[in-house]
UniProtKB/Swiss-Prot annotation:
One GO term of the biological process aspect: photosynthesis
Quaternary structure note: The 4 large subunits of the cytochrome b6-f complex are cytochrome b6, subunit IV (17 kDa polypeptide, PetD), cytochrome f and the Rieske protein, while the 4 small subunits are PetG, PetL, PetM and PetN. The complex functions as a dimer.
KW Hydrolase (keyword) present: no
Record membrane topology: Single-pass membrane protein
Location(s), subcellular: Plastid, Chloroplast thylakoid membrane
InterPro entries (alphabetical): PetM_cyt_b6/f_cplx_su7 (IPR012595)
Highest classification ranks of the organism: Eukaryota, Sar, Stramenopiles, Ochrophyta, Bacillariophyta
Residues passing through the membrane, by range: 19-37
GO CC annotation terms, alphabetical: chloroplast thylakoid membrane; cytochrome b6f complex
Record's keyword terms, sorted: Chloroplast, Electron transport, Membrane, Photosynthesis, Plastid, Thylakoid, Transmembrane, Transmembrane helix, Transport
Similarity-based family: Belongs to the PetM family.
Main localization (coarse): plastid
Protein name: Cytochrome b6-f complex subunit 7
Molecular function via GO: electron transfer activity
Length: 42
């Protein structure tokens, strides 16, 4: 977390937490979608 704050000194903890949450949810959604496509294709 300290490394992120060093890279983005203007970002406070709330913005960084929201951004990380959005990225994590997007990756989770994409992996879930690909898993469903694999199941549907079989």
């Amino acid at each position: 977390m300290a490394l992120i704050l060093q890279i983005f000194p203007f970002a406070n903890a709330e913005i960084v937490t929201a951004a990380v949450t959005c990225i994590f949810m997007t990756l989770f959604g994409l992996s879930l979608g690909f898993a469903l496509l694999k199941v549907q294709g079989e």
